[in-house]
UniProtKB/Swiss-Prot annotation:
Catalytic activity, reaction form: L-phenylalanine + O2 + H2O + H(+) = 2-phenylacetaldehyde + H2O2 + NH4(+) + CO2; L-dopa + O2 + H2O + H(+) = 3,4-dihydroxyphenylacetaldehyde + H2O2 + NH4(+) + CO2
Cofactors named for this entry: pyridoxal 5'-phosphate
Protein name: Phenylacetaldehyde synthase
A Pfam family per the record: Pyridoxal_deC
Length: 490
């Protein structure tokens, strides 16, 4: 293959990599140095980039300097800056030097580790680091790789939930017969992430068989065991087959924590696969004072947390543990002739292709390994505790202002609050909170999001960006107060 100059292309030339790599690292370092100069939420309009880029790809090579100039002028204006210290909209998607270096190393090695033989280190390192994190979380030994359980890295919590739902579905169908699919019933609270709904659609679970159980402020939006028991009993009486329960530790809307032990007891006694989704809050549970929130996980069949949220590991890196790896492999294993090899055929190794939806997989364990080694567990605990401390401070600021109220008790580093309602005018209050959110986000100085709880529009301040300090939290509150004052007096 020749490029425009007649020279044969060498796409991984070591010297060019060294030259361009230095330029790219400098560019990224400068970006982080100046990240506060950008509006946190992109202010562009839909379709903006089509007007700035050509209709077709270049025929001949351009320089990296030209590309980076376009990144500065055309791409960065269309970026919402998730790593900004004033990003409070969603749960964090942490980046770090260690995570970045691990990602770089993974890209540089360029392996595809779908089976042990395709890169033994990729499989074995993944098993080791998932065991490391399981020990930090004090998970039961059944989730460790030395037995029939183990951990695997998925792309997202959505993939993790889909994988275990399919495993649970096939496990019960092997017992009751494949024609019973239309009788299978899934249970969750109305605070469970929409990923479960999508997983049910993919797995062929009829929407009428998805029990979305109502929660309210009396339990801080946690699922009541009584609600689950009543639903399961009704379905059994109707001749249906309860088979899957998804509980939450740190819901997306308000960080509600479901009572795992009580829910697990019901699930276990009825042969229901019990999955615990701790995508966000799982990271905090490496701190002894927050481990209580996953008490009862010993009753679960599977458990997931996102290292790419609050664990300084660049996206994507969702950690899933199961007690019975056979349930996964029986549901997801494929073994065409071109993938057969001695180690796999002899059952001597783990082939992670059979623990996930796709075949191909990146060397994602490298970045998690780098994070654990370059920071250590004690530093990670301090990092998480600092965000929780900042959230406590923000909560106190809100509580001291009579124009605002805290809607749900803060547990981790999310504060749910709103402008207080005018007497008997809840609808007007909701509109006013929407207006406040739009005003704050349009300023470009910070970015927040909202949710709805019991019909109330609630503002969410999720503290967790890697660069966030006390001054950013105080500045955010100052802007919120200023915009609120304008709305209340206009």
């Amino acid at each position: 293959m020749e490029n425009g100059s007649g020279k044969v292309l060498k796409p991984m030339d070591s010297e060019q990599l060294r030259e361009y790599g230095h330029l790219m690292v400098d560019f990224i370092a400068d970006y982080y140095k100046t990240i506060e100069d950008f509006p946190v939420l992109s202010q562009v309009q839909p379709g903006y980039l089509h007007k700035l880029l050509p209709d077709s790809a270049p025929d001949h090579p351009e320089t990296l300097d030209q590309v980076l100039d376009d990144v500065r002028a055309k791409i960065l204006p269309g970026v919402t800056h998730w790593q900004s210290p004033s990003f409070f909209a969603y749960y964090p998607s942490n980046s770090s030097v260690a995570g970045f270096l691990g990602e770089m190393l993974s890209a540089g090695l360029g392996i595809v580790g779908f089976s042990w033989v395709t890169s033994p280190a990729a499989t074995e390192l993944e098993m080791i680091v998932l065991d490391w994190v399981a020990k930090l979380l004090n998970l039961p030994e059944q989730f460790m790789s030395k037995g029939n359980g183990g951990g695997v890295i998925q792309g997202s919590a959505s993939e993790a939930v889909l994988v275990v739902l399919i495993a649970a579905r096939d496990k019960v169908l092997r017992s009751v017969g494949k024609n019973a699919l239309e009788k299978l019933v899934v249970y969750s609270s109305d605070q469970t992430h929409s990923a479960l709904q999508k997983a049910c659609q993919i797995a062929g679970i009829h929407p009428e068989n998805c029990r979305v159980l109502t929660t309210d402020s009396s339990t801080n939006y946690a699922l009541r065991p009584e609600s689950l028991q009543e639903a399961v009993s009704r379905d059994l009486e109707a001749g249906l087959i309860p088979f899957f329960l998804c509980a939450n530790v740190g819901t997306t809307s308000s960080t509600a924590v479901d009572p795992l032990a009580a829910l697990g007891k019901i699930a276990n006694s009825n042969g229901i696969w019990f999955h615990v989704d701790a995508a966000y809050a799982g990271s905090a549970c490496i701190c002894p004072e927050y481990r209580q929130y996953i008490d009862g996980v010993e009753t679960a069949d599977s458990f997931n947390m996102n290292a790419h949220k609050w664990f300084l590991t660049n996206f994507d890196c969702s950690l899933l543990w199961v007690k019975d790896q056979d349930s996964l492999t029986l549901a997801l294993s494929t073994n065409p002739e071109f993938l057969k090899n001695k180690a796999s055929q002899a059952n001597l190794v783990v082939d992670y292709k059979d623990w996930q939806i796709p075949l191909g997989r990146r060397f994602r364990s490298l970045k998690l390994w780098m994070v654990l080694r370059l920071y250590g567990s004690e530093t990670l605990k301090s990092y998480i505790r600092n965000h929780i401390k900042l959230a406590k401070e923000f909560e106190q600021l809100v509580s001291q202002d009579p124009n605002f109220e805290i809607v749900t008790p803060r547990i981790f580093a999310l504060v749910c609050f709103r402008l207080v309602p005018v007497k008997d005018e809840e609808k007007k209050c909701n509109n006013r909170n929407r207006e406040l959110l739009d005003a704050v986000n349009s300023s470009g100085k910070l970015f927040m999001s909202h949710t709805a709880l019991s019909g109330k529009i609630v503002l969410r301040c999720a503290i967790g960006a890697p660069l966030t300090e006390e001054k950013h939290v105080k500045e955010a509150w100052k802007i919120i107060q200023e915009e609120a004052s304008y709305l209340l007096h206009k």
